[in-house]
Curated annotation (Swiss-Prot):
Gene3D superfamilies in the record: Ribosomal protein L11, C-terminal domain, Ribosomal protein L11/L12, N-terminal domain
Originating species: Mesorhizobium japonicum (strain LMG 29417 / CECT 9101 / MAFF 303099)
Annotated function: Forms part of the ribosomal stalk which helps the ribosome interact with GTP-bound translation factors.
Cellular component aspect of the GO annotation: cytosolic large ribosomal subunit
Keywords tagged on the record: Methylation, Ribonucleoprotein, Ribosomal protein, RNA-binding, rRNA-binding
Source organism, top-level taxon: Bacteria
Subunit composition and interactions: Part of the ribosomal stalk of the 50S ribosomal subunit. Interacts with L10 and the large rRNA to form the base of the stalk. L10 forms an elongated spine to which L12 dimers bind in a sequential fashion forming a multimeric L10(L12)X complex.
Keyword Lipid metabolism attributed: no
Entry similarity comment: Belongs to the universal ribosomal protein uL11 family.
PTM: One or more lysine residues are methylated.
GO biological process: translation
Protein name: Large ribosomal subunit protein uL11
Pfam families listed in its UniProt record: Ribosomal_L11, Ribosomal_L11_N
Amino acid sequence: MAKKIAGQLKLQVSAGSATPSPPIGPALGQRGINIMEFCKAFNAQTQEMEKGSPVPVVITYYQDKSFTFVMKTPPVSYFLKKAANLKSGSKEPGKVKAGTVSRDKVREIATAKMKDLNANDVEAAMRMVEGSARSMGLEVVG
């Protein structure tokens, strides 16, 4: 018989640096999930990733207090800021440009995010990434 799902929890955790301190510890603890077990498993799986990159993770926890988790790719905004060498996007995206991103970089980001985006092909994924770039005040050139 399959385990009964008690719920799901979505977090964004820095790759390779999951610790029992807030916000991870309290979020997991109040649901009865073993915090150290999650931290060890998450850090082991994110060893190969760039340290400090934000990784969205969906944790499914069961009534017997066990859990499974699925990691997604870092957010598009993270990739765009990295490609444009920015700390943050524009404060006024429609008026003030924060920087530029080449179409090749957009294609690279779209290819990396393809499995997490709701797109059928790379061109559709590129349009989604370009929309994110515009909303951050970045100009797509090339």
